[in-house]
Amino acid sequence: MNNDIEFFIKKFNVSRETIEKLNIYNDFLLENNKLLNLIGKTTEKHVFSRHFKDSAQIYNLIEDKSEIIDIGSGAGFPGIIINILMVNDKIKGNVVLIDKSPKKCKFLQDLSNKLSLMLKIENIRLEDYKFSKISTVVSRAFKKTVDTIDILFKNNEKIRNIILMKGKTYQQELDDAKKKYTFHVEKFRSITSDESYILKISDIKLTTT
């Protein structure tokens, strides 16, 4: 058995149907990658380990799955993977994928239809999206931490949780964000890269001067 598929079975107790959805996702992603540049060419042979597994690791960090917003979704990471696992677990909740590229949004909608997912695709600038106070925001390979908080805080000061998937500059990004905001942060080492971390940020407030 493929080690990456075994990971999903052991970690998330996924069904055969869910494994089939992941395989469909893999094939459709590769089929569209040349045209849309969804993932780096060097990762095309490692979609499960580099992208699917990486995205799935934040699933259990999302305590409230009633509304999840994936910002800068692009190829659907991590939002599509999260929604696939929610369907596997029969968890109801709203999942929204936001991306400013019309072509990538069409890819996401076509993929959602292929996988029979119930999610919403928003072709909109993040600055123009109105967040609910119950939203949990997730992102992977998006803007710098302080820039992300700037946009989210401006749109809704009551967002509960932000889960950011970051590379080796995560600490510098946190330090920069703390110059402008106070917040609670939990750090989790990535299971796919020793240099990467997941940041779970909450209780955000502007620093008073």
Whereabouts are the PLM-identified features?
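Class I SAM-dependent transferase core
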Residues: 1-64, 69, 103-106, 110-117
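Active-site capping/gating segments
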Residues: 169-209
